[in-house]
Design a protein with these regions (language model features):
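Glycine-rich, aromatic-bearing surface loops/beta-hairpins
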Residues: 141, 145-215
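N-terminal glycine-/serine-/threonine-rich phosphate-binding loop
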Residues: 31-59, 79-92
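Short glycine-enriched, charge-decorated loop/helix-capping segments at active-site entrances
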Residues: 73-79
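Ligand-binding beta-strand-loop-alpha-helix segment within the catalytic cores
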Residues: 96-159, 165
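Short, Lys/Arg-enriched N-terminal segments with co-localized hydrophobic residues
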Residues: 1-30
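Glycine-rich beta-strand-to-loop/alpha-helix junction loops that act as flexible
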Residues: 61-66, 103
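Solvent-exposed alpha-helices and their adjacent loops that cap or buttress functional pockets
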Residues: 51-53, 135, 181-186
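Generic secondary-structure signature for well-ordered alpha-helical cores
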Residues: 45, 49-52, 90-98, 144-152, ...
Length: 215
């Protein structure tokens, strides 16, 4: 009986993320929140170098704090990790005038948190729902805390985005989507992917894709 109880407690501990100061104890391993912040910022900066974003463009973030901890997506949301990632990205994007949209989980139909002014300017469909740890996730809660007037919208057409933990952001990035490679492949224990976009190339045999109208 004692052996069973020991194994049960050990399993519970191994699935737990405890925040002590700036250190996350994840499954018995230490992970500095500053390390998560640094990796996130490095990844974002490398993406921005290739994404050619302009002022007032929208950038989508999909993230799983569970996956960052090495756990199954949606099972172990952690608000401290969520705040670290969202605040890092939001602060950087503000510097260049780009708007952040934070995607929620499937339980909210992958709705997104944006500033109300962004929703109104882009004629986005606002929906009535509030995120929680188990429906929307830690990233959306962090966005609600960070934004001035946060709202949830059903759909956006972002120019670029970052996906931390294989949350699938493609439905919210404009055509044509282009995968971007950076030196950062993981944040914590989560797989990271990136998308930018370009206008479609249209036309047939006579179409040109550079300005040369008389030839």
């Amino acid at each position: 009986t004692l052996y069973i109880v020991y194994n049960l407690l050990n399993n519970i501990f191994s699935q737990t993320c405890v925040i002590i100061g700036h250190i996350a104890i994840i499954g018995g391993e230490k992970m500095e929140l500053t390390e998560i912040k640094e990796k996130t910022l490095q990844a974002l900066n490398e993406l921005l170098e290739q994404a050619n974003l302009k002022k007032d463009d929208i950038f989508v973030l999909g993230m799983s704090t569970s996956e960052i901890q090495g756990q199954h997506i949606g099972k172990h949301s952690n608000i401290d990790i969520g705040r670290t990632v969202v605040n890092t990205i939001n602060d950087r994007l503000k510097e260049i005038g780009v708007h952040l949209a934070v995607q929620g989980c499937e339980h909210l139909n992958r709705a997104l948190v944006v500033e109300e002014s962004v929703a109104e300017k882009n004629n986005l469909e606002i929906v009535t729902v509030y995120p929680s740890l188990h429906a929307g996730g830690a990233g959306q809660i962090a966005a609600f805390e960070a934004f001035d007037n946060p709202v949830e919208v059903e759909h956006i057409t972002a120019k670029a985005g970052m996906d931390i933990g294989d949350t699938s952001i493609g439905m919210h990035v404009k055509f044509v989507q282009i995968p971007v490679r950076t030196s950062v492949t993981e944040i914590g224990k989560a797989h990271v992917t990136f998308l930018r976009s370009r206008p479609k190339l249209i036309g047939g045999q006579r179409a040109k894709y550079t300005w040369d109208p008389f030839n």
